[in-house]
């Protein structure tokens, strides 16, 4: 199980993980690591929250919010943000399903993808700033948001089909069991509830899960399934929705 954790941490972050710590795991086994997603989010969000706490006394709330969101993007190598941009480029192209999927595979950034990145990153910075001004404990809020975003992404994996024939998302989409889904969601709810001291965390998590479930159904109807890009989009939007629900 520890090998699986390190493999997942290396897969969805840019944190330096020695390859020997996950040695012997096949890529096809990665679907079992979905239950680790909330804990990985907890680590990444915790680092982002620490950066906010350290910088706030020195440069103020707005710049601390900017740098903690920048750190979060760097910690993931922009992996999920790239998925968000590709998803928006495809969905908002208003083309046929097959053409949408082709556009999503194009490495070039389109207008819709660029606008989505600007909106989501700016919204995160503004929401983090507002939460801090309201006295919200930012270490807990950011850690919980990242755990919620990654945990809720399982809703786009369970009983969904992969919209393409190949790709990174194929290791998760349609391969996750009901038991793994329940454990992943349960862990995300527990993390949010513990960090945010009870009902606020639980209510915020319910809002996030409902929004991501609806997003998954809309993407399924539009694309005929999910891709690695839509998983990245769900994680980014899940984080933002969680933070917004805390306001």
Swiss-Prot record:
Residue ranges of the TM segments: 34-54, 59-79, 113-133, 138-158, 194-214
Cofactor(s), by name: Mg(2+)
GO CC annotation terms, alphabetical: plasma membrane
Metabolic or biological pathway: Cofactor biosynthesis; adenosylcobalamin biosynthesis; adenosylcobalamin from cob(II)yrinate a,c-diamide: step 7/7
GO biological process, one term: cobalamin biosynthetic process
Catalytic activity entry: alpha-ribazole + adenosylcob(III)inamide-GDP = adenosylcob(III)alamin + GMP + H(+); alpha-ribazole 5'-phosphate + adenosylcob(III)inamide-GDP = adenosylcob(III)alamin 5'-phosphate + GMP + H(+)
Annotated function: Joins adenosylcobinamide-GDP and alpha-ribazole to generate adenosylcobalamin (Ado-cobalamin). Also synthesizes adenosylcobalamin 5'-phosphate from adenosylcobinamide-GDP and alpha-ribazole 5'-phosphate.
Record's protein name: Adenosylcobinamide-GDP ribazoletransferase
Organism: Salmonella typhi
Lineage per the UniProt record: Bacteria, Pseudomonadati, Pseudomonadota, Gammaproteobacteria, Enterobacterales
